[in-house]
Amino acid sequence: MQLLKASDIISHLQIDGIFPGGNAIPCTHLNNYMNIKEKQLMNTIADVQSSRDLRNLPINQVGIKDLRFPITLQTAEGIQSTIARLTMTVYLPAEQKGTHMSRFVALMEQHAEALDFAQLRKLTTEMVALLDSRAGKISVSFPFFRKKTAPVSGIRSLLDYDVCLTGEIKDGAYGHSMKVMIPVTSLCPCSKEISQYGAHNQRSHVTVSLTADAEVGIEEVIDYVEAQASCQLYGLLKRPDEKYVTEKAYENPKFVEDMVRDVATSLIADKRIKSFVVESENFESIHNHSAYAYIAYP
């Protein structure tokens, strides 16, 4: 590969009429020159994606998956920074060979606003327009952290939750959904009933997926679930706290069936929520398998 000398660059600039002469090249002139040359180069490169496809098969979703990207979240408890994994896809008509993959990343690079449902709608709308499509979907998955206070000592610590926000444009309409996984403690009612002392308990993952007519906060979904668990989880506990959570779980036993039914009852009472799925997986401490339950509403 032959390297271009500074004198050669000056010569090209002089020939193109961008920089008339001299020994120093101002950055603005050089940037203008490079932008012009880049556009000229792009015009000479074949755009294969935009060529015609003859197989007559549309693609429901095509795009990028698992793009890791730093985001900020606008939540009820303030702005939070986190790292997201994004899947961004659009509908591709039968006659078009391919989509423009670089445009998905370019769109994310342009957005610095904190993410909430309003911003997700804006992002999805812009993506569909940018890709010249009639339908598109963006899923944003990220760890969400919440500061929790230990029940006795009052010590504060963070606990993480897995969240996925999805925005979709389909058939000319926009819709969004939210999925939150909340870790909790469950204690077996049967074990408590038949044992002279103690009962087996374990960590459980309760996952809520919902759609709503009005915005429902991530924190609200977490509160609904934690209120129905045998006990909440905490990032940091002292001995008095550990005693408290152990005894609270013992006094509030829940089967996996109880968990999904009680959470579902709370969600049904919230008139903003129009549909949901509740799942609970109990990582049984006395078995090498999990207990599982699922409710879909309506």
UniProtKB/Swiss-Prot annotation:
Keyword NAD: no
Pathway stated in the Swiss-Prot or TrEMBL entry: Cofactor biosynthesis; 7,8-dihydroneopterin triphosphate biosynthesis; 7,8-dihydroneopterin triphosphate from GTP: step 1/1
One term of GO molecular function: GTP cyclohydrolase activity
GO BP annotations listed: tetrahydrofolate biosynthetic process
E.C. designation(s): 3.5.4.16
Keyword DNA-binding: no
A Pfam family: GCHY-1
Site residues (May be catalytically important), renumbered to this chain: 188
Catalytic activity: GTP + H2O = 7,8-dihydroneopterin 3'-triphosphate + formate + H(+)
Enzyme class, broadest EC rank: hydrolase
HAMAP family: GTP_cyclohydrol_B (MF_01527_B)
Family: Belongs to the GTP cyclohydrolase IV family.
Described purpose of this protein according to its UniProt entry: Converts GTP to 7,8-dihydroneopterin triphosphate.
Name this protein carries in UniProt: GTP cyclohydrolase FolE2
Organism from which the protein derives: Neisseria meningitidis serogroup B (strain ATCC BAA-335 / MC58)
Lineage: Bacteria, Pseudomonadati, Pseudomonadota, Betaproteobacteria, Neisseriales
Gene: folE2
